[in-house]
Amino acid sequence: MQGIGEVFTRHDDLTALTSGDTPRANNEAMTKIYHLAAENDLPVMLHSNITSKREKNPLYLKEVEEPLRNHPHTRFIWAHAGTSAEIHRHQTQLPFLLPTLTRMLEAYPNLFIDLSWSMLTPYLLDEQGKPRAEWLALVEKYPERFMLGSDVVGRFNKLGQEMHSYKPFLDALPEAVARKVARDNFLAILPRNTEKSAAPR
């Protein structure tokens, strides 16, 4: 085993279809998973929306911050930085996302950001497909904390096309940083002792 996830916690329509308690990253039931991950040096990838379709503030941020704070020895990859296509159908862009991520990356060294799916546009690239300077600056400030992803599900023939979409953004980064974001950061977050993580419990 190389990691846990993508674990769907708060997730647009999937949350609405869930009976009982809303799935949350800070639910007590997740604690054992986070401990297991830390004990076995496994990263945990969480899908946890930062807000709802309508609220113009990071309404659900606490649900991600609590595990980050309470489990400092667990490495968390925040899928799509808490954004989603459904949120963007109602709010084109979240103006609080960049400052929120800036603060969180400084506060939580165990936080890593997945740039897949809803992150490419409208965040990394503008409407003309040009890299946004403020996002380039954030990635350059934390060059080991971002990684690409495809979020391709069931249509793997489109994988190359999806990954190629990031080329304008990667080309605008210093070469060493681009290599980290495109490949090295993901490899670095995987278990350092693969024999231990693969051993049966």
State each model region's role.
Residues 4, 37, 80, 113, ...:
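Conserved, mostly hydrophobic/aromatic
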Residues 1-11:
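Active-site-adjacent structural elements in enzyme catalytic domains
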Residues 11, 19-147:
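Catalytic pocket-lining loop regions of alpha/beta-barrel enzymes
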Residues 141-147, 152-201:
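Mid-to-C-terminal alpha-helical segments outside catalytic/metal-binding sites
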Residues 14:
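Glycine/Thr-rich phosphate-binding loops of Rossmann-like dinucleotide-binding domains
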Residues 5-7, 84, 151, 193:
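Compositionally biased, intrinsically disordered low-complexity regions
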